[in-house]
Swiss-Prot record:
Catalytic residues (UniProt): H97
GO molecular function, one term: metal ion binding
Site (Transition state stabilizer): R93
Gene responsible for this protein: katG
Sequence similarity: Belongs to the peroxidase family. Peroxidase/catalase subfamily.
Keyword hit for Oxidoreductase: yes
Protein source organism: Desulfatibacillum aliphaticivorans
Native organism taxonomy: Bacteria, Pseudomonadati, Thermodesulfobacteriota, Desulfobacteria, Desulfobacterales
Protein name: Catalase-peroxidase
Record-listed cross-link Tryptophyl-tyrosyl-methioninium (Tyr-Met) (with W-96), residues: Y224-M250
Length: 736
């Protein structure tokens, strides 16, 4: 054997080096995955801890970037020629597929992180040849560097593409920060085969056609629906049902869906010029010398008129690089016949086409083609709900243009959160209901003396530490770092649906809110100037006062940070249906689970912690502290490993780790455990899976041991206060 085949250290035949070999996950596939809590660390980010993207973006000459993008649109490159001499449709598809991974069920996906650059999205079958779009953008990204992220640039390129083809957009907001490693927290499905149909193992469908939550795409590797129809079956009516379900899960209603489909397909064409078997591997599987590009095709020239992408071939309308009513006009004007594309895909061609509606070839001006529609397109004509909407848009071009512009803005900005995060000169002034608007601060804020006085009044109101802490947690912990929704700002906990969620114990919640509203009313009425306190601030302040009181009960003097400035949203600013997805079906921090789930309780806890942007130590200290503060749902004693009441001690960890206790499952509930004295057999404690995992899981136990040591009390209080403040402030983008 050649010396080159041997390890330079051991001299043995080379094997995978650092990070290779059989992994813990291979040995123990059911091991709790805590890695999702430690993604995107400073160790993977080349920009450094002091880098402030928002400040850099503010220095960007956005107008100059847009001019460069407009120029690029028609600067066709030989290595990847532009269809019809215009890259606009390609960039629209790139931006659309960047944003289109968003699903409202858990808020994950979307354009906000630039993750299309990384696996798995850079190699998804539905993203075929979008690697070329990003490579075309590289000179512009290279020119402006750190002042514009890839995430922002991809969306901006889509906007400029639309504008360059004749439609003014609704606006653009910057502020999306790039990630630098693949996102591990996003569940894309369980299938082990790209584009697996619903009859394959580990399908995302059950029942007649019930799509697994929180997924929105119909197949692994697709962004939306299968354009050929459900599982490739060319049935427009059935396709309409898929389209409706998928777009609804992306937070789009029927009118927005029709506008997006019809508006998006006003531009460009599909590519299926030949046998898909001639297309090479995706970027992540491509040879090193391809330099990050994939899908190299040996069909003809492999580009231009020989391009193979989706497998469907053709354009929807006569002028594919101009905003007009051509798509809807052609859709309703003609009957359609089912054919196979050169790549073998199901598609539809218009019958008996007038010459004026024939489409000039994208690369040969001497050729013309009949307009094409996908099965999904035809759902706009045959679905009984979509059809009248589409006809109305056809008859009202201005309404259609406005509907598409607004829906496109929503599509590309949905995961950014509130307007407070928007940057740049093109931010629309209009408040939109899906942005969860909150009134701007219009009064003088409370000062340190007011804060101290209000805390004293709250503690003297008769509300317990448990009530104060639980209410503040219920308000703030709705936040999702995935799409920056939820949180305490706005005090929407007083409105439906949040006030009625089971986890919030509605009757108990109303008592607390009424008491706090009384304190708010008295304080505001007693001010001679314009000073006020919002209920949103008072809810959080009450929680902070409760934590401080519990720390005092433990002999610690803890000052919990508090920054006023939250405002109270109006009920008309609150879309109840939209907020319903924020309801916790399980909240391990409150030892709550609405029902039995196939997923283990500790996995649901980690998922929730990740949405709250918590690390494993933060999750650990919060669970241990909240148990001591009486924050359990229904005043349950599960996990309350202490004989003290409302006292912020490290008893949870001390007693959890006590070898004098032996644990066994409860005879009444397999997810509840009983801890008995090892010697006497006397019952000492009860706990759930969420409680015991901090003693069972080796990584979490290592953290728990830090807080369970004799010198752990002080650090426990400090770390709990810091983690508490983090959760209370997650939505305070105004403080950034």
């Amino acid at each position: 054997m050649s010396e080159n085949g041997k390890c330079p250290v051991t001299g043995k035949t080379s094997k995978p080096v650092a990070g290779g070999g059989t992994s813990n996950q291979d040995w123990w596939p059911n091991q709790l995955n805590l890695n999702i809590l430690h993604q995107q660390s400073s160790k993977s980010n080349p920009m450094g801890g002091d880098f402030n993207y928002a400040e850099e973006f503010k220095k960007l000459d956005l107008k100059a970037v847009k001019e460069d993008l407009y120029t690029l649109m028609t600067d066709s490159q030989e290595w990847w020629p532009a269809d019809y001499g215009h890259y606009g449709p390609l960039f629209i598809r790139m931006a659309w597929h960047s944003a289109g991974t968003y699903r409202m069920g858990d808020g994950r996906g979307g354009a906000g992180s630039g993750s299309q650059r990384l696996a798995p999205l850079n190699s998804w079958p539905d993203n075929v040849n979008l690697d070329k779009a990003r490579r075309l953008l590289w000179p512009i990204k290279q020119k402006y560097g750190k002042r514009i992220s890839w995430a922002d640039l991809m969306v901006l390129a889509g906007n400029c593409a639309i504008e360059s083809m004749g439609l003014p957009t609704f606006g653009f907001a910057g502020g999306r920060e790039d990630v630098w490693e693949p996102e591990q927290d996003v569940y894309w499905g369980s299938e082990e085969e790209w584009l697996a149909t619903s009859d394959k193992p580990k399908s995302r469908y059950s029942g007649e056609r019930d799509l697994e939550n929180p997924l929105a795409a119909v197949q692994m590797g697709l962004i939306y629906v299968n354009p050929e129809g459900p599982d490739g079956n060319p049935d427009p009516i059935a396709s309409g049902k898929d389209v409706r379900e998928t777009f609804a899960r992306m937070a789009m209603n029927d009118e927005e869906t029709v506008a997006l489909v019809a508006g998006g397909h006003t531009f460009g064409k599909c590519h299926g010029a030949g046998d898909a078997a001639l297309v090479g591997p995706e970027p992540e599987a491509a040879p090193l010398e391809e330099m990050g590009l994939g899908w190299k095709s040996s069909h003809g020239r492999g580009k231009g008129g020989d391009t193979i992408s989706s497998g469907i071939e053709g354009a929807w309308k006569p002028r594919p690089t101009t905003w007009d009513m051509g798509y809807l006009k052609v859709l309703f004007k003609y009957d359609w016949e089912l054919v196979k594309s050169p790549a073998g895909a199901n598609q539809w061609l218009a019958k008996d086409v007038d010459d004026e509606d024939m489409v000039v070839d994208a690369h040969d001006p001497d050729k013309k083609h009949r307009p094409m529609m996908t099965t999904a397109d035809l759902s706009l004509k045959f679905d009984p709900i979509y059809e009248p909407i589409a006809r109305r848009y056809l008859e009202n071009p201005e309404e259609f243009a406005d509907a598409f512009a607004r829906a496109w803005f929503k599509l590309t900005h949905r995961d950014m959160g509130p307007r407070a995060r928007y940057l740049g000169p093109e931010v629309p002034e209009e408040d939109l209901i899906w942005q969860d608007p909150i009134p701007a601060v219009d009064h003088e804020l409370i000062d340190d003396k007011d804060i101290a006085d209000l805390k004293a009044k709250i503690l003297a109101s008769g509300l317990s530490v448990s009530q104060l802490v639980t209410t503040a947690w219920a308000s703030a912990s709705t936040f999702r770092g995935s799409d920056n929704r939820g949180g305490a700002n706005g005090a929407r906990i007083r409105f439906a649906p949040q006030k009625d969620w089971a986890v919030n114990q509605p009757a108990e919640l109303q008592k607390v809110l009424q008491a706090l509203e009384g304190i708010q009313k008295d304080f505001n009425a007693g001010q001679s100037g314009g000073k006020k306190v919002s209920l949103a601030d008072l809810i959080v302040l009450g929680g902070c006062a409760g934590v401080e009181k519990a720390a005092q009960n433990a002999g610690a003097d803890a000052a919990v940070p508090f920054a006023p400035g939250r405002m109270d949203a109006l009920e008309e600013q609150t879309d109840g249906d939209s907020f319903s997805v924020l309801e916790p079906k399980a909240d391990g921090f409150r030892n709550f689970q609405k029902a039995k789930f196939a997923v283990k309780a500790e996995e649901l806890l980690v998922d929730r912690a990740q949405l709250l942007t918590l690390t494993a130590p933060e999750m650990t200290v919060l669970v241990g502290g909240l148990r001591m503060l009486g924050a359990n749902y229904g005043n349950s004693k599960h996990g309350v490993f202490t004989d003290k009441s409302e006292t912020l001690t490290n008893d949870f960890f001390v007693n959890l780790l006590d070898m004098g206790t032996v644990w066994k499952p409860s005879a009444n509930d397999e997810d509840v455990f009983e801890g008995s004295d090892r010697k006497t057999g006397a019952l000492k404690w009860t706990g759930t899976r969420v409680d015991l995992v901090f003693g069972s899981n080796s990584q979490l136990r290592a953290i728990a041991e830090v807080y369970g040591c004799e010198d752990g009390q002080e650090k426990f209080v400090q770390d709990f206060v810091a983690a508490w403040d983090k959760v209370m402030s997650l939505d305070r983008f105004d403080l950034a």
